[in-house]
Amino acid sequence: MSGEGDTTLKAICYKPGSLQLLDQRKLPLETIYLEIRDASDGWSAIQEMVVRGAPAIAIAAALSLAVEVFNFHGFDGSASDAVAFLENKLDYLVSSRPTAVNLADAALKLKHVIAKALATATEAKSIFKAYIEASEDMLEDDVVSNKAIGNFGLSLLRQQAKNPDKLSVLTHCNTGSLATAGYGTALGVIRALHTQGILERAYCTETRPFNQGSRLTAFELVHEKIPATLIADSAAAALMKDGRVDGVIVGADRVASNGDTANKIGTYSLALCAKHHGIPFYVAAPLTSVDLSLSSGKEIVIEERSPKELMHTHGGLGERIAAPGISVWNPAFDMTPAELIAGIITEKGVITKNGNDTFDISSFAKKITGNSSR
């Protein structure tokens, strides 16, 4: 399916029994949607970077399995067999991108849904129905969550800015509609600033080696007619020294309970530069990106990707540019310590520090849970 002629930026196009993912490897030159028929297609699309961005990965994985079971014809097993089938498929999908906690979190929540359904189900189709409905809810909930992040981020940046009516911000990688179900996290905050008429300029890094900034974020910013400038990754420090930005805002693939954050490679460098220049550095992410089982970022598994992404143009898809025989180290993410982060913007509010260098996200989560249960 081709997306040509459709001006709406959507990474995920879904209806019951059908899923297409925008092939982000082709952007911004081609807009092509790939048909995803089952969990195997979903795994490959995630692993091969057809779809990327922690929230979008989780939703695409869940829906790929939803499409598979929707189109089942004559599953012979029992309700218990259906649960076992889904659990095995979810474990398989989680292996596609181990650093992004949203994917593992979504799988765990879906396992809870089908386990609960098993208590009353008499046949497999009841289990599959419960799974499909829960997956579809995740798609809808992500957009609502992103808009809340945008609004909280808007308020925070205005409160802490020297001139709250004119703000310029720097972002890294891609955290917009293409990385989520819609609207975006860090880019959603930028979108909210623009909507309110107080964004002077958004700066985005190219984000090598896969160029998510130059290919995807720049594409979204131009599409939304947001005033924006693309910079080389290595120009960020000079940009800050010149006083061109009021804040740096990035997304997250996994946040430990103390606030240490794993995000696209280069994030740590930006945080260090921001600290040196006295510029606030923010993380914008849904609470599904937080892994409370991890006490610090030292426990986060950092994915390493193919050397080809550095040795060839276009993130490994183009012609060779590196000298034959050179060794390559290509981590996809790095870990930014909490001490460099000014605040973590979530859909439930902004997490701040309690007078030390780290965050107490567990207490924040408990407070939110307590308030929502009243």
UniProtKB/Swiss-Prot annotation:
One Gene Ontology CC term in the entry: mitochondrion
Residue numbers annotated as active site: 253
Keywords: Acetylation, Amino-acid biosynthesis, Cytoplasm, Isomerase, Methionine biosynthesis, Nucleus
GO biological-process terms attached to the record: L-methionine salvage from methylthioadenosine
Annotated localization: Cytoplasm; Nucleus
Catalyzed reaction equations: 5-(methylsulfanyl)-alpha-D-ribose 1-phosphate = 5-(methylsulfanyl)-D-ribulose 1-phosphate
Pathway info: Amino-acid biosynthesis; L-methionine biosynthesis via salvage pathway; L-methionine from S-methyl-5-thio-alpha-D-ribose 1-phosphate: step 1/6
Marked site: Transition state stabilizer: 173
Coiled coil: none
Residues with N-acetylserine modification: 2
Family: Belongs to the eIF-2B alpha/beta/delta subunits family. MtnA subfamily.
Listed PANTHER family: METHYLTHIORIBOSE-1-PHOSPHATE ISOMERASE (PTHR43475:SF1)
Family annotation (NCBIfam families): eIF-2B_rel, PRK05720.1, salvage_mtnA
Name by which UniProt lists this protein: Methylthioribose-1-phosphate isomerase
Protein source organism: Arabidopsis thaliana (Mouse-ear cress)
